[in-house]
């Protein structure tokens, strides 16, 4: 027998399920936020801006497909760090696909969607973009750990890599699925977002806070990576001659430029959207006109998925060569096992070991044995 206390819960669940299939809810929420009139006046098929955005998304999809093909076809890239780069390419590819679908289902088509379909349309974007940002954080964590240990990760660390990658997707799915699981404003019209009329403002604030913390974490990790490299470079100046010290300083400056590019692009792509979402939380309905231009801010964040393959892949010399071979429809190299394997530590940086690292001699202090060399943004550790 169902208890009296559970009856309200059952009724609420039934009401929520019925609301998810109610077409009128979309119209009601868009009308409340002022987006309904905008849609009626301007939406006559696909807008020119939408066509441009779709073309950009197609380019993003293609370049990330080539990155995945490069990693898949090149055996020497079947290593933990490249799994992270492959995961980033996959999430960026899905971001391009999700935004293309979002654009095709926008405009007048929006009012033909049920709330459940609307949540899937927007939630897929949140999942893909969240996975992309979490992947950037995972890469920063992996490279920071690599710098701390000053040695290549062996196969035993594959489990940690897959654990981090799995965590990226699980957290992203949960984050993107919260609205359809109940954290929405269907029953509270006054709490609705203007940018996303079925999303609760508290959810928007929560997501903005999470992404801001991720951004700060990535900035801190890359600053720490540069600090570690700079510190080890200074140690060498006390043991090497003036010419080597000067050369080390120049290469450290090149590394700093690489870090600045990475962080500047990331902040430039995401900060405008963060600011817009904070305005959305603070503004009442129909009071902030800038909120009706949200697609320009969102496409800027999606553009980050187009810059990631350039920054995180093509700055690696070996990946760049393999990438060009894939594009040229040539066979990918099987990899020279006798050669040095280079692993990126930060974008545009590669990490390698000399053969003497495999000797039976015990490892000495950083200042005694491993010489940290920074050239053109590439970091190598050699004996």
Curated annotation (Swiss-Prot):
Disulfide bonds, paired cysteine numbers: 185-192, 283-288
Subcellular location: Cell membrane; Endosome; Membrane raft
Modified residues (N6-acetyllysine): 11
Extracellular side: 1-47, 106-117, 184-197, 280-290
Biased composition range(s): Polar residues: 372-383
Residue(s) carrying Phosphoserine: 352, 354
Name of encoding gene: S1pr1
Cellular component, GO annotation: cytoplasm; endosome; external side of plasma membrane; membrane raft; nucleoplasm; plasma membrane; presynapse
Glycosylation sites (chain numbering): 31
UniProt xrefs under Pfam families: 7tm_1
Keyword Lyase: no
Main location: membrane
Covalent lipid adducts (S-palmitoyl cysteine), residues: 329
Protein name as it appears in the record: Sphingosine 1-phosphate receptor 1
Organism: Rattus norvegicus
Posttranslational modification: Palmitoylated by ZDHHC5. Palmitoylation is required for targeting to plasma membrane, enabling G(i) coupling.
GO biological process: actin cytoskeleton organization; adenylate cyclase-activating G protein-coupled receptor signaling pathway; adenylate cyclase-inhibiting G protein-coupled receptor signaling pathway; angiogenesis; blood vessel maturation; brain development; cardiac muscle tissue growth involved in heart morphogenesis; cell migration
Sequence positions bearing Phosphothreonine: 237
Region Disordered, annotated ranges: 349-383
Ranges that cross the membrane: 48-69, 84-105, 118-139, 162-183, 198-225, 259-279, 291-311
Annotated function: G-protein coupled receptor for the bioactive lysosphingolipid sphingosine 1-phosphate (S1P) that seems to be coupled to the G(i) subclass of heteromeric G proteins. Signaling leads to the activation of RAC1, SRC, PTK2/FAK1 and MAP kinases. Plays an important role in cell migration, probably via its role in the reorganization of the actin cytoskeleton and the formation of lamellipodia in response to stimuli that increase the activity of the sphingosine kinase SPHK1. Required for normal chemotaxis toward sphingosine 1-phosphate.
GO molecular function, one term: G protein-coupled receptor binding
Topological type in the membrane: Multi-pass membrane protein
Keyword hit for Transmembrane: yes
């Amino acid at each position: 027998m169902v208890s009296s206390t559970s009856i309200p819960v059952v009724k609420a669940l039934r009401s929520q399920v019925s609301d998810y299939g109610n077409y009128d809810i979309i119209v009601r929420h868009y009308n409340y936020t002022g987006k309904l009139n905008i849609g009626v006046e301007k939406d006559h098929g696909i807008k020119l801006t939408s066509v441009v955005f779709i073309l950009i998304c197609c380019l993003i999809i293609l370049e990330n497909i080539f990155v995945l093909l490069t990693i898949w076809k090149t055996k020497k890239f079947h290593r933990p760090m490249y799994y992270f780069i492959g995961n980033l390419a996959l999430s960026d590819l899905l971001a391009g696909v999700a935004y293309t679908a979002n654009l095709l289902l926008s405009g007048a088509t929006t009012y033909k969607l049920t709330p459940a379909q609307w949540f899937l349309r927007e939630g897929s974007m949140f999942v893909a973009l969240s996975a992309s940002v979490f992947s950037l954080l995972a890469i920063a964590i992996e490279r920071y750990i690599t710098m701390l240990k000053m040695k290549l990760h062996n196969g035993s660390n594959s489990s940690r890599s897959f654990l981090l990658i799995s965590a990226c997707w699980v957290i992203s799915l949960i984050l993107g699925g919260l609205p359809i699981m109940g954290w929405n404003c269907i029953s509270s019209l006054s709490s609705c977002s203007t940018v996303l009329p079925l999303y609760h403002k508290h959810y928007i604030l929560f997501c903005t806070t999470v992404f801001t913390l991720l951004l700060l974490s990535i900035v801190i990790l890359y600053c720490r990576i540069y600090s570690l490299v700079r510190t080890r470079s200074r140690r060498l100046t006390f043991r090497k001659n003036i010419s080597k010290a000067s050369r080390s300083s120049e290469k450290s400056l090149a590394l700093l430029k690489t870090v600045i590019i990475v962080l500047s692009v990331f902040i430039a792509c995401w900060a405008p959207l963060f600011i817009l979402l904070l305005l959305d939380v603070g503004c009442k309905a129909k009071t902030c006109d800038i909120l009706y231009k949200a697609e320009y801010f969102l496409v800027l964040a999606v553009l980050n998925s187009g810059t990631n393959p350039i920054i995180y892949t093509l700055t690696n010399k070996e990946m760049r060569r393999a990438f060009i071979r894939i594009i040229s429809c040539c066979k990918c190299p099987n990899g020279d096992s006798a050669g040095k394997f280079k692993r990126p530590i930060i974008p545009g940086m590669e990490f390698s070991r000399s053969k003497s690292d495999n000797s039976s001699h015990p490892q000495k202090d950083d200042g005694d044995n491993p010489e940290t060399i920074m050239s053109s943004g590439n970091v190598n550790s050699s004996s």
